[in-house]
Amino acid sequence: MAINSKFKMLVLSHDGAHDGQLQKIYDLNQANTPEVGSLESKKHLTKLLELSAYNLLILKGDEVIGFIICMREGSDYGSENYKFFSKKLKKFLYVDRVAIDKKYRREGLGKAIYDDIFNEAKIENLPIALEVNTEPVNQPSLNFHEKMGFDQIGAKEFADHSVAYFIK
């Protein structure tokens, strides 16, 4: 589906990424740490995709320039942040990670991804759940999610970082 004349989105099945796409997703993820959690390896990314329920790629031509990975309730995902929502919500769509290449930010791509996620969640009337780092602070993400209508429902401090939990 086209976002505009320059970019398109592609729904990615959990086993649908080819090796070049996996490498680019991994590289984008690592380039966006600590805003998104670091991945140990491309194998770790593959495991996340296997656990995931809904994923999108943003492409410019054939180049992957952004992605989002989402989980549903009932997953075996071991993330403490995911577990927070599992304890609070019966059904949900959890945004595990989203990243856009720095060169393509402020072009409406984040909004386009979330608009698609909102439409997907609407099918089953699911709340969308996510966390944002508050230490170190990810102010652009906090601002973005506030603007998109997310409400904070909790927070947690870890040994090396802190997060705020949001739903919409």
Per-segment meaning from a language model:
Residues I69-R97:
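Conserved acyl-donor/pantetheine-binding loop and adjacent beta-alpha core of acyl/acetyltransferases
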Residues A2-K43, E63-I65:
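Short amphipathic alpha-helix that is part of the acyltransferase structural core
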Residues D96-R106, T134-E135:
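A short, internal acetyl-CoA/4′-phosphopantetheine-binding micro-motif in the GNAT/acyltransferase core
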Residues A121-T134:
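Conserved GNAT acetyl-CoA-binding A-motif
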Residues I100, R106-N119, K147:
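Conserved acetyl-CoA-binding loop-helix of GNAT-fold acetyltransferases
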Residues K6, A155-K168:
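C-terminal "cap" of GNAT-fold acetyltransferases
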Residues Y54-R72:
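Conserved beta-hairpin
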Residues E135-G154:
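Conserved active-site alpha-helix within GNAT-family acetyltransferase domains
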